């Protein structure tokens, strides 16, 4: 079942797309967008998670700047629009919005109160920030840009964390990837997987660098991780 809800956050209200599984109660996964907003790709990801037995909740992260952003990943104009939103985005405020979304998901009547966060690109960074600053049951990061700038916060990580990095990612350099791996190697509850030959957003539906084999491997690891940590 698909619906839209309103989350009452610390700084105001914002919308979220919700996909529910057939069988409840169920654990929840907060799904965090790229620069394209809660678009068709993010909604499809939520629907797939619901089919696997999770309540998927995708909050509108850009609500302070522009509500209900829904951009086409194949449009250059939309890419430039999303990039402008990304460059002006307040990451600290965004992490608090994610914290508020996690709290709202846990309070849903059909939720078991177990909540993970999963994010892509900007959403991947916010997943990392949420995991090191606040309480979540599990975290999954897909190619979180600029994560290397926040590695001094890794000591705050308590929840299990799974990270996916494309080795050829044009937005996350090899030195940045090595720094991320080194920092997380000190955390026994963190696992980082590298995907040879893969670029940024290799797992994104309809993305320019989509690779079905690598995406299936990464997503399979994600689904197994979520089932183990949330059930």
What are these regions (language model features)?
Residues 1-231:
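N-terminal cap/leader regions of alpha/beta-hydrolase-fold enzymes
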């Amino acid at each position: 079942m698909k619906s839209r809800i309103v989350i009452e956050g610390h700084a105001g209200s914002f919308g979220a797309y919700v996909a529910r599984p057939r069988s409840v109660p169920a654990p929840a996964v907060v799904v965090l967008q790229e620069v394209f907003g809660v678009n068709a790709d993010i909604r499809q990801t939520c629907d797939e998670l619901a089919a696997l037995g999770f309540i998927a909740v995708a909050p509108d992260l850009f609500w302070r700047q522009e509500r209900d952003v829904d951009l086409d990943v194949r449009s250059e104009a939309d890419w430039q629009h999303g990039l402008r939103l990304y460059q002006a985005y307040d990451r600290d405020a965004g992490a608090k919005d994610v914290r508020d979304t996690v709290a709202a998901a846990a309070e849903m009547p059909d939720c078991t109160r177990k909540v993970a966060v999963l994010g892509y690109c900007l959403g991947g960074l916010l997943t990392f920030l949420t995991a090191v600053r606040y309480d979540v049951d599990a975290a999954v990061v897909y190619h979180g840009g600029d994560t290397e700038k926040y590695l001094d916060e890794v000591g705050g990580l308590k929840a299990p964390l799974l990270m996916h990095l494309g080795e050829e990612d044009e937005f996350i350099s090899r030195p940045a990837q090595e720094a991320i791996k080194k920092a997380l190697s000190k955390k026994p509850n963190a696992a980082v997987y590298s995907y040879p030959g893969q670029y940024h957003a290799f797992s994104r539906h309809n993305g320019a660098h989509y690779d079905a084999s690598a995406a299936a491997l990464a997503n399979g690891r994600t689904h197994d991780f979520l089932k183990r940590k949330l059930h």
